[in-house]
Amino acid sequence: MNKPKTDYAGYACCVICGLIVGIIFTATLLKVVERKLVHTPSIDKTIKDAYIREDCPTDWISYNNKCIHLSTDRKTWEEGRNTCKALNPNSDLIKIETPNELSFLRSLRRGYWVGESEILNQTTPYNFIAKNATKNGNIFVAQRILPNCIRVTLYNNYTTFLSYHYFG
């Protein structure tokens, strides 16, 4: 008695087609998520509503007598700092001095590089920034990357520490 032949080529074709569709779907989903992280309506509205001073360079925004440049580029702390200085020789990564500045920056970015580390306890690698800025459960965490370098991130039940982040 002859066994019916199994069409392995047909199965293989279906599996390959399924894998291709899955890869395309995943790649598309990752692009959508990345765009939402970089270009969110709240960021765009905040930037448009920000006061532009004449003494700030073109495309920079003003807050609390500081000119701020926002970038969508992902860079290391050192690359971000070098880019700041290349944009304007007198510029550097921002120094957060008040809870209001922290709140303003939070409305612009979820994470960013800053240029000062004095707000951290020098003996521990992690510390909360501006404890009176933690109202409504919004806690920002700083991670010491280098002796004079910290990265600020929103703590939302978990925090992912990366070596690259947006700089501002």
Curated annotation (Swiss-Prot):
GO-annotated cellular components: host cell membrane; membrane
InterPro entries reported in the protein's UniProt record: C-type_lectin-like, C-type_lectin-like/link_sf, CTDL_fold, NKG2/CD94_NK_receptors
Transmembrane parts of this sequence: 10-30
Signal sequence range: none
GO biological process: positive regulation of natural killer cell mediated cytotoxicity; stimulatory C-type lectin receptor signaling pathway
Keywords for the protein's UniProt record, in alphabetical order: Early protein, Host membrane, Lectin, Membrane, Signal-anchor, Transmembrane, Transmembrane helix
Membrane topology of this protein: Single-pass type II membrane protein
Protein name (record): Protein A40
Phylogenetic classification of the source organism: Viruses, Varidnaviria, Bamfordvirae, Nucleocytoviricota, Pokkesviricetes
